[in-house]
Each structure stands twice: as structure tokens, then as C-alpha cells.
Amino acid sequence: MSKEKVILAYSGGLDTSVAITWLKKDYDVVSVCMDVGEGKDLDFIHDKALKVGAVESYVIDVKDEFATDYVLVAHQSHAYYEQKYPLVSALSRPLISKKLVEIAHQIGATTIAHGCTGKGNDQVRFEVSIAALDLNLKVIAPVREWKWSREEEIYYAKENGVPVPADLDNPYSVDQNLWGRANECGILENPWNQAPEEAFGITTSPEQAPDMPEYIEIEFSEGVPVSLNGEVLKLADLIQKLNEIAGKHGVGRIDHVENRLVGIKSREIYECPGAVTLLTAHKEIEDLTLVREVAHFKPIIENELSNLIYNALWFSSATQALIAYIKETQKVVNGTAKVKLYKGSAQVVARKSPSSLYDENLATYTSADTFDQDAAVGFIKLWGLPTKVHSEVQKSAK
């Protein structure tokens, strides 16, 4: 009699490898690893899952879908959770959940498993997303259920023939995708400890970065980055290339104590060279092209959208409504930003746009000025009228 199938979100690490062994007693385990741009050896991960005991092993390249359907939303909405974190991990979880559900439907599985602990945000993101897509799917969290210490987990792995990674003594917990790299644990858990250089993986120390600045040009079409230094690229490829270029200059290092969804504070080290560079450049093109009222209101939407995505609500109607608003604002966001990369900073030093609302003849103080300064007197009188009336009423009341 065949066992029920379970779909396991598989990373290739110790937790999910042990999970295969733990689950296969009661299920036929189908492992699924998604490539969101973390740069792992996918062939190795595929084979390892089968070696440990999975009956099937899927490795799926979703970088392009991740870039266009998820990262682009964060990019166009300048998504920084608590004004610092560009939502690196939070963005990939809805997509991973979506693919897990799709595969479950394809092979007739009724259960999905993940390798999250009981104190992180990701358990919530996976389970809320899966429930939003299919309420009938059961979710198992082996790591949360077994409550083993690291030593007990290693002992179980060795007893059951699960390969123990050679870098297991590495104190850090790292998650990486196209949009950046997140690092926690070890010495980083004490917020008074400066993050050592070994905690960083995709950026050069600003002190060790090149002594000469590098200038790059990023072109946007309706808010979408379409070319880098004149070369037209797919979004995923453009982000990867920017990660290399800006990372070399130490751009995008973020040290942040954040408020987790589960109620605790956590110290995180993020490296987001491509993200920070793109977000900086995009904002400058918006400054040229958005009317004042949209430019002033959009940050309110951006902040709320960042919170919703961080807090596991990608598939909520509120999130989708705010995404629709953001997309509407991007129709005029066309242009090119010139960015100076130098020792940890990404600074826009020039910008141009065919949709620009900047009129040099109105802005200039030279003889080319076309601004009607005589109109200022009447404007000031009407603009200040409510304040004048209020002041007069207050005086008469005394």
C-alpha cells in the first residue's frame, strides 16, 4: 500500500534533509527546491534529496518570475520594512508557497511541509500563503514539532545516514536571493557586537572598496529597470549584474534590529547592493515625473504595503489593492538615472526623463525665466486666507 505524498520545501541544508528522513516513515516525500537567485549548487541539492530518501526531487528555476512578479512590486513601492529592510526573504516566501501548492495539485498531494522553526517569520508566511491558495492542504513543520537541540539533530542525522554539512560550525543563518542576503545568529545576536567582516558574503567592506568611484546608468520604462549602461537586460539579469557591480563598492550593507511578526526583536545583517542602487535610482526618476500629490501620498501606501508583505499577507485583498495603486503610478516613470558608486554609497548625480515635469525655464533664475512672478501676490493672499481668518478669530475671542 502506497503512502500519502508530502511536498517538502527543500533547501539542501541539515534541517530539511533531516526532515526527509523524519517524514519518510509516514509519507512519500517529494522535495521541491526553488532557485530564486541564491547561487546554490542545484544539481547537488537535487541528488542529495534523493539520497536522503525523497521519492522525487524537483529543482525549479523561478528567478524570472520572482523578479517580475514579486521583486518588481517591492522596487516600485520602495519597500523598506521599518524604513531599513528591503524585504529580501519576505518577498520569496509567497512565490515558494505558490509553487508548492501548484506541485501538490499536480501530483495529488494533500500535505505540504517546510523547515521553519517556531520563532521565525517564515513559518507564518508559508502557512498563511498556502492557506490563502488552498484551504484544504495540510501543513507540517517538522523542525517546529521535534523541538530538538542542534546537537540532538546532528545525532539523529548521523544515526540515519543524513550527510552533515562540513560548515556546520558556521554560527550564522543565511538566506539569499536576487534581492539580497540576510544573515543572523552567532555573534550577531548581541546588538552591541559589531558585525565581523566574515558575516558579509556579497559586498566588499566600504573601507576596502575601490578608491575611484564608478558611474553607471540605469534606464526605466514605466517604472521597470530595462537597461544598465545601455545594455538591455531581463530584470533578473539586471539585478544580478547590479549586485556584482554595486557589491564591489560596498553598497547596500544594512545593520538592523527589527520587530518580527511573532513579537520579538531580532538583529539582522542585510546585504542588498542591487536593491539599494535600484531603489535609489528609481526614486529620483519618480521625483522628476510624478505630480506633487502622488509623490506625497505614495510613501504612505509604500509603508503600509511593506508592512503587509513583511507580515505574511501578500495574498490578502489589501496587499493586491495597494499593488494596483502602485502600478498605476508607474505609467509615467520613464527615464535614466546616473548613479555614482563609491565606498558604500549609491548616489544619483544626474537624471533625465521624456516624461519629466521639471521645466528649466520655470525653475531658472536667469533671464530665461518664464515664471509669472506677478501672480505670486494673489496666490499668497488666497493660500494664507484660512490662516489669516483663524488668527483674526482667535484675537477677537480674547
Curated annotation (Swiss-Prot):
Q: Which reaction equations make up its catalytic activity?
A: L-citrulline + L-aspartate + ATP = 2-(N(omega)-L-arginino)succinate + AMP + diphosphate + H(+)
Under the heading CDD domains, the entry gives: ASS
The alphabetical list of record keywords is: Amino-acid biosynthesis, Arginine biosynthesis, ATP-binding, Cytoplasm, Ligase, Nucleotide-binding
Positions that bind L-aspartate: 117, 121-122
Q: Could you tell me where this protein is found in the cell?
A: Cytoplasm
Q: Which Pfam families match?
A: Arginosuc_syn_C (PF20979), Arginosuc_synth (PF00764)
UniProt-listed InterPro entries: Arginosuc_syn_C (IPR048268), Arginosuc_syn_N (IPR048267), Arginosuc_synth (IPR001518), Arginosuc_synth_CS (IPR018223), Arginosuc_synth_type_1_subfam (IPR023434), AS_cat/multimer_dom_body (IPR024074), Rossmann-like_a/b/a_fold (IPR014729)
Q: Which GO terms describe its biological process?
A: argininosuccinate metabolic process; L-arginine biosynthetic process; urea cycle
**Under which pathway is this protein filed?**
Amino-acid biosynthesis; L-arginine biosynthesis; L-arginine from L-ornithine and carbamoyl phosphate: step 2/3
- The catalytic activity of this protein is classed by the Enzyme Commission as 6.3.4.5
- Residues at which L-citrulline binds: 85, 121, 125, 173, 258, 270
Q: Is Metal-binding one of the keywords? A: no
Q: Which residues does the record give as ATP binding sites?
A: 9-17, 115
Q: Tell me the GO molecular function terms.
A: argininosuccinate synthase activity; ATP binding
GO cellular component, alphabetical, reads: cytoplasm
Q: Which family does this protein fall into? A: Belongs to the argininosuccinate synthase family. Type 1 subfamily.
Describe its assembly: Homotetramer.
Q: What is this protein called?
A: Argininosuccinate synthase
Origin organism lineage = Bacteria, Bacillati, Bacillota, Bacilli, Lactobacillales
